[in-house]
UniProtKB/Swiss-Prot annotation:
Phosphorylation increases by IL-6. Residues 381-423 are annotated as: Tail. SUPFAM superfamilies: Intermediate filament protein, coiled coil region. It comes from Rattus norvegicus (Rat). There are two types of cytoskeletal and microfibrillar keratin: I (acidic; 40-55 kDa) and II (neutral to basic; 56-70 kDa). The modification Omega-N-methylarginine is found at residue 46. Residues 69-121 are annotated as: Interaction with TRADD. This is Keratin, type I cytoskeletal 18. Keywords: Acetylation, Coiled coil, Cytoplasm, Glycoprotein, Intermediate filament, Isopeptide bond, Keratin, Methylation, Nucleus, Phosphoprotein, Ubl conjugation. Expressed on the plasma membrane of hepatocytes and in the narrow apical portions of supporting cells in the vomeronasal sensory epithelium. Detected in the type III alveolar cells of the lung, in the proliferative crypt epithelium of the small intestine and in the older intragemmal cells of the tongue. The record marks 264, 324 as: Stutter.
Length: 423
């Protein structure tokens, strides 16, 4: 982006003298040139000034056509005195201009070539710092992502831990129930064994009682000694009958014993099967519980490691943020310092520009008056005091036009145009 700015400066009005020429005056031209280059804030301003001063020794001669009037002599003497004083001022201004040029040249040599300060190393430092800030921001984002991943992993482990804990509690509850079942089964088995023992004792008691009754009956029969003859059919053999009854009782007892043995054997087998099954289930449950405890310990260890890693990452994040905060404060301080230097440089350039404009206005005034004196000295034959007095009341305006070409906020070229307007 480039654009051109044009500024116009008008100096204050001043009075100029009319043209007077004396025939006996010889004029010797003296020329001087000045070139000033100054820069502020990375912009340059080139000002070239050329001026010509005509001076000479004014001899004492009478003014043609004026009749030796005393007032005209006094006027010429006054003009000569003013010319000498202005020539002295011009010399002083040239000396001051050379001194200012040397100062400006020294200042430009200190600031760099062509009045443009080299900000390249600052830009390079800023770019490096920006790259570091970007890299640190990426590292910070990666650390935050790792923290989020660790937090999610910790949440997953917490959910797994709660699930495994619920499973463990359920298995422990099942084991407790199975233990109650085993205890109930053992109690039932003991009760059945007690009943079997009682039935065995009852069977032995019945056998003994039966034998005693049989022996009693046999004794009664043997001791009676009675012979009864009855015209009746042949009586049955009592011993045989008793043997049959004994055999029936023994068969019945054997049958009852076998049924009881079979029943209680079946009950014992069923109880043993149940106990074996429950024992296998208990062993499986104990194995599962052991595995769950190991898994729980592993998860607790992983959870502790994740917590420690999370704490370390948070500490690293805090340190990184603190370090970058300090770096940002340092960079802000550097930027403020550079901005203050830039503002001082611009202010110094503006001050020097104002001083130069003031000197240029004075120089233009002096050149105009010197030109007037030169015309007075050259055109002495046509000089008229009334014309000189009339022309002394005329006004002149110095118009100074400055044109600057700005590209991307920087002044790349500047031209000055000075014009003297008479009124």
């Amino acid at each position: 982006m480039s654009f051109t700015t044009r500024s116009t400066t008008f100096s204050t009005n001043y009075r100029s003298l009319g043209s007077v020429r004396t025939p006996s005056q010889r004029v010797r031209p003296a020329s001087s040139a000045a070139s000033v280059y100054a820069g502020a804030g990375g912009s340059g301003s080139r000002i070239s000034v050329s001026r010509s001063v005509w001076g000479g020794s004014v001899g004492s001669a009478g003014l043609a056509g004026m009749g030796g009037v005393q007032t005209e002599k006094e006027t010429m003497q006054d003009l000569n005195d003013r010319l000498a004083s202005y020539l002295d001022k011009v010399k002083n201004l040239e000396t001051e201009n050379r001194r200012l040029e040397s100062k400006i040249r020294e200042y430009l040599e200190k600031r760099g070539p062509q009045g443009v300060r080299d900000w390249g190393h600052y830009f390079k430092t800023i770019e490096d710092l920006r790259a570091q800030i970007f890299a640190n921001s990426v590292d910070n984002a990666r650390i935050v992502l790792q923290i989020d991943n660790a937090r999610l992993a910790a949440d997953d482990f917490r959910v797994k831990y709660e699930t495994e804990l619920a499973m463990r509690q359920s298995v422990e509850s099942d084991i407790h129930g199975l233990r109650k079942v085993v205890d109930d089964t053992n109690i039932t088995r003991l009760q059945l064994e007690t009943e079997i023992e009682a039935l065995k004792e009852e069977l032995l008691f019945m056998k003994k009682n039966h034998e005693e009754e049989v022996q009693g009956l046999e004794a009664q029969i043997a001791s009676s000694g009675l012979t009864v003859e009855v015209d009746a059919p042949k009586s049955q053999d009592l011993s045989k009958i008793m043997a049959d009854i004994r055999a029936q009782y023994e068969q019945l007892a054997q049958k009852n014993r076998e049924e009881l043995d079979k029943y209680w054997s079946q009950q014992i087998e069923e109880s043993t099967t149940v106990v074996t099954t429950k024992s296998a289930e208990i062993r499986d449950a104990e194995t599962t519980l052991l595995e769950l405890r190991r898994t729980l310990q592993t998860l607790e260890i992983d959870l502790d490691s994740m917590k420690n890693q999370n704490i370390n990452l948070e500490n690293n994040l805090g340190e990184v943020e603190a370090r970058y905060r300090v770096q940002m404060e340092q960079l802000n301080g550097v930027l403020l310092h550079l901005e203050s230097e830039l503002a001082q440089t611009r202010a110094e350039g503006q001050r020097q520009t104002q001083e130069y404009e003031a000197l240029l206005n004075i120089k233009v005034k002096l050149e105009a008056e010197i030109a007037t004196y030169r015309r007075l000295l050259e055109d002495g034959d046509d000089f008229s005091l009334n014309d000189a007095l009339d022309s002394s009341n005329s006004m002149q305006t110095v118009q100074r036009t400055t044109t600057r070409k700005v590209v991307d906020g920087k002044v790349v070229s500047e031209t000055n145009d000075t014009r003297v307007l008479r009124h």
